[in-house]
Amino acid sequence: HGTINIDTGFIVYNERNYPNFVKLIQELDIQTQPSSMSFSVRLANPDLEYNGSTLRQLFVDKRNLFRPWFYKMLRDILRFNRMAAAAIDGRPTNWTLRELLDEHGFSQPFIEYYLVPMGAAIWSTPVTQVLDIPAHFFIQFFENHGMLTVDDRPEWRVIKGGSCQYVKEIIKPFANRIRLNHTVRQVERFPDHVTVDGERFDEIVFACHSDQALEILKDPSPAERSVLGAIPYRVNEVVLHTDTSLLPRRRQAWAAWNYHSSDPLENNGPVALTYNMNILQALNVPDTFCVTLNDSSSINDEDVLERFEYHHPLFTLEGIAAQKRHAEISGIARTHYCGAYWG
């Protein structure tokens, strides 16, 4: 049947929000293709299922036609999209999403069945922590990614053949010098060099998580402790599989991103989410390949292809303030930092 490359980590990008990445893949002459960023919600309590892409898919569960609270949710989505950007004007940066929603009287169905699932899915964050995200951060992300409008959304794209294609190209000049599965235990800085486990180098780039960098540094500065220590990570269990029972029950509701939960706001555990990779990567194959976060117990063991463990940054008030301090620690003492935790 040939080989199919399926991404389980990095998947999509768009030209508006990823200009440097776009330049990189153009420089490497990497082929890309359009993707879909459709989103569905499936809840057990209440028994609810919808896909937000089209009017028909919103009402794929015919009971939604006769639920007054479902229409209230839809009205509040439109109201939130209209007023969100103006609502944060003049507000302190530590003003939370919860405070914004309370002040403007948004309904419980909108919060529990739309906004919280969306936020939990985007940032791989427990549902109970979504409302504590700073409103500025949340709304600016939505605005920058065209999520507060229906007519100015960026076109999302994927790497044709999977993200391994650009990785192979970028490492070509030095592939034989990469040391895989090589644990770094300690980095020490000196005025004219740095050492990595005793081996001497001119400079060092920490392309890893904030907490990992802090653990490896022998003598972190007060600024490094403050900045890197302010951005925690959370473990997410990831499974690549072909069990379509993790997708919405109604096939017409299947989306690229599929959120599922038993209790919308009672679950303090990690977000449960299934990516339909056939939709995301435009795979024209008989099997439906899924990537599920944090719901491995629901997956049929016979359908499991591979298991992974990923760590995602948690965006707290302290962490978002720390993101603005990149220049205080990067490029200093022969040390440079990059990673998803910078936002």
Predicted feature residues:
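Short beta-strand to alpha-helix junction loop
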Residues: 10-18, 91-95, 104, 147-169, ...
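Mid-domain catalytic core of redox enzymes
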Residues: 182-312
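General small-molecule cofactor/ligand-binding pocket signal
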Residues: 33, 177-181, 336
